[in-house]
Design a protein with these regions (language model features):
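ABC-type ATPase nucleotide-binding domains, specifically the catalytic core motifs of the NBD
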Residues: 12, 30, 68, 93-111, ...
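Conserved ABC transporter NBD signature motif
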Residues: 56-63, 76, 109-113
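Conserved ABC ATPase signature
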Residues: 130-134, 138
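Helix-to-loop junction immediately C-terminal to a conserved catalytic motif
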Residues: 48
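ABC ATPase C-loop
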Residues: 147-148
Length: 154
C-alpha cells in the first residue's frame, strides 16, 4: 500500500531524514521509533506532502505520489493528524469536523461524523464548543477525528 524508496526529506537545506526505505502492507500496524530529532514526524509529514521531498520516491498503491501536492495526496486517501493539532480554534467542534468533508467531499457527512463520534463520544457532548476551549485531550481527539472524516486509506 505504501512504499518509501530511498526517501530523503527536509526543510530547505536541512535534511531531516536521509535515504530511508520502508514498505507497509495493508492491514498492518507499523511504528516509527527513534530518538528526538531522528526524522520520524518529518517522514510522515513528507508522505502527506507537508515537508519537502529531496530525493527518492513515495509509492501509494500503484501510484507514484512523490510530486503530488498535499491536497492531491488527501484525495488519494492520505490523512495526517499533526503534532501541533492545527485546529481552527475559533470554529466549533462541529465546524472543525465539517472541514474534513470540505477538503474531501462526501455525500455521507452524517455517517462519517457519527463514526467519529462513536470513536470519541466526548466530542459529541462538545459539538457547539469552540475548539480553542477544549482540553488538550479533547483537542487531540478532534484533530484525529477531523483526519478520519476524510475516510483515509492511510
Amino acid at each position: 500500500m505504501l512504499e518509501l524508496v530511498n526517501l530523503s526529506c527536509g526543510y530547505g537545506a536541512f535534511n531531516a531524514a536521509a535515504d530511508f526505505s520502508l514498505k507497509l502492507r495493508p492491514g498492518t500496524i507499523t511504528a516509527l521509533l527513534g530518538a528526538n530529532g531522528a526524522g520520524k514526524s518529518s517522514t510522515l509529514m513528507c508522505v502527506a506532502g507537508h515537508v519537502d521531498l529531496q530525493a527518492g520516491k513515495i509509492l501509494f498503491g500503484e501510484q507514484d505520489i512523490s510530486q503530488l501536492p498535499a491536497t492531491e495526496r488527501v484525495r488519494a486517501g492520505i490523512a495526517i493528524s499533526p503534532e501541533g493539532r492545527r485546529l481552527f480554534k475559533d470554529l466549533s467542534v462541529q465546524d472543525n469536523l465539517r472541514v474534513g468533508g470540505l477538503i474531501h467531499p462526501s455525500s455521507a457527512y452524517a455517517k462519517d461524523r457519527d463514526r467519529v463520534l462513536d470513536l470519541f463520544p466526548r466530542l459529541g457532548e462538545r459539538m457547539a464548543s469552540l475548539a480553542g476551549n477544549l482540553s488538550g485531550g479533547e483537542q487531540q481527539m478532534l484533530a484525529i477525528g477531523r483526519a478520519l472524516m476524510l475516510n483515509p486509506k492511510l
